[in-house]
């Protein structure tokens, strides 16, 4: 938006939160954005906020452009390249991870249920994230096939 003020981190953050609150109807009062990349332990958002955002985008004019940026399962050069290989045509999602954190959010296009926005946020564990990625994949398969 153009409000004739010089751009800076705070005004940019305020604009993003204002857009999310007014357009996507997301309660941003408990949301914390610490950096623009999303790769910070200080970023805090909920699965509800993310799925609300995904639902809003799906109903918006940005739907096709946004979905085209998400990797599909088993697709080369994507974060799901080694995951959900046989479900590649049914899932478009983005991963996110840090030590002790494994997240997966996006859309499932189920032949049975149609499109479903989802967000699986798993954190607070020690050791390998593989069991959590396996659980996420099992949940996605259940959403696809019922």
Model-derived features: where do they sit?
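A small/polar active-site loop signature that marks catalytic segments
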Residues: 1-64
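Short, mixed-charge aromatic SLiMs
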Residues: 18, 73-83
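Loop/turn elements at helix/coil->beta-strand transitions in domains of secreted/extracellular proteins
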Residues: 28-29, 114-117
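Active-site-proximal beta-strand/loop segments in catalytic clefts of secreted hydrolases
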Residues: 34-36, 69-70, 95, 120-124
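Flexible loop/turn segments at secondary-structure boundaries
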Residues: 39-41, 77-79, 126-128
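Active/binding-pocket-proximal capping segment
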Residues: 63-77, 138
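Short, Gly/Ser/Thr-enriched beta-strand-loop segments that form substrate-interacting elements
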Residues: 81-112, 121
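C-terminal transmembrane beta-barrel domains of outer membrane proteins
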Residues: 117-145
């Amino acid at each position: 938006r153009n409000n004739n003020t010089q751009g800076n981190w705070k005004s940019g953050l305020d604009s993003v939160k204002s857009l999310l609150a007014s357009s996507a109807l997301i309660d941003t009062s408990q949301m914390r954005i610490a950096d623009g990349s999303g790769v910070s332990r200080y970023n805090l958002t909920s699965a509800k906020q993310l799925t609300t955002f995904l639902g809003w985008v799906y109903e918006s004019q940005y739907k096709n452009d946004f979905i085209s940026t998400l990797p599909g399962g088993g697709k080369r050069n994507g974060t799901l390249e080694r995951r959900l290989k046989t479900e590649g045509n049914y899932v478009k999602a983005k991963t996110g991870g840090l030590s002790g954190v494994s997240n997966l959010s996006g859309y499932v296009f189920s032949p049975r249920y149609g499109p479903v926005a989802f967000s699986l946020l798993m954190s607070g564990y020690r050791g390998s994230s593989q069991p959590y990625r396996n659980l996420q994949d099992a949940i996605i398969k259940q959403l696809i096939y019922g």
